[in-house]
Design a protein with these regions (language model features):
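Hydrophobic/aromatic-rich core segments of domains that either
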Residues: 127-190
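N-terminal, post-signal-peptide region of Sec/Tat-exported proteins
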Residues: 55-90
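Boundary at the C-terminal end of the N-terminal hydrophobic targeting segment
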Residues: 24-33
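Bacterial N-terminal signal peptides that target proteins for export
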Residues: 1-13
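Bacterial N-terminal signal peptides
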Residues: 11-22
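Second-shell loop/turn segments in exported
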Residues: 47-49, 64-76, 104-117
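Low-complexity, Gly/Ser/Thr/Pro-rich intrinsically disordered linker/tail segments
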Residues: 191-202
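Mid-length scaffold segments of soluble, non-membrane domains
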Residues: 81-138
């Protein structure tokens, strides 16, 4: 009986070890697996260019997010760096550098992005990071909007994340030039902005 018990204990131990190692290996595989992401451009996703993120990209994102694993604030800083790298890869895929904000009359111009394109692409990146379990302190939320013209604000969209405390944060890439740092601050503050002042968007 004692011998059988010993065999059972060893078998159980090996099962646990294999499960843990297997889960870790699966996590590593997911983090480096290739992914094709459709990149919107031309305003309101008039065009879509496929961006292939391979193992090298996965390793780069993993290193970036690992550096922000210490706190929610550090992770948001890492997300900013991940967005900048993602936009550099986007530029290489499309071959055209997007200008900051949106120029009226630039609709259907390949490579130029309005806030719909920007928020859609950023959301896709955040989902990519979440799928690979690279976000420890935040989860991806639905994109948010503000502005209705009648309230003196031009309609504007942004990607959104939330922290464990429930605070929602925008990841708004529209204002910066392509590859620049996105605006990351509370959604509640973002909702109040965007009033037309001196002919410019705030």
């Amino acid at each position: 009986m004692g011998g059988n018990l010993g065999v059972f204990v060893r078998a159980t131990f090996l099962t646990v070890v294999i499960t843990v190692v297997g889960s870790a290996a699966a996590g590593e595989l997911a983090a480096t697996a290739s992914k094709r992401i459709p990149i919107c451009h031309g305003y309101s996703c008039n065009y879509r260019t496929m961006l292939a993120l391979g193992p090298a990209d996965g390793a780069r994102f993993r290193a970036i997010l690992r550096a922000g694993a210490g706190s929610p604030q550090a992770e948001r800083s890492a997300i900013s760096k991940a967005v900048r790298y993602f936009e550099q890869r986007t530029f290489r895929a499309i071959g055209v550098r997007d200008l900051p904000q949106s120029e009226f009359g630039a609709s259907r111009i390949r490579g130029q992005m309005d806030c719909v394109d920007e928020s859609t692409n950023t959301h896709a990146l955040l989902v990519y990071l979440a799928e690979r379990k690279l976000l420890r302190f935040h989860k991806v939320e639905r994109n948010a909007s503000r502005g209705l013209f009648v309230d003196g604000r031009y309609p504007h969209w942004t990607a959104v994340i939330s922290d464990r405390g429930g605070t929602e944060w925008v990841v708004d890439t529209w204002y910066a030039p392509m590859g620049g740092a996105p605006d990351i601050f509370p959604l509640s503050q973002w909702k109040k902005r965007g009033v037309l002042e001196s002919g410019a968007l705030n």
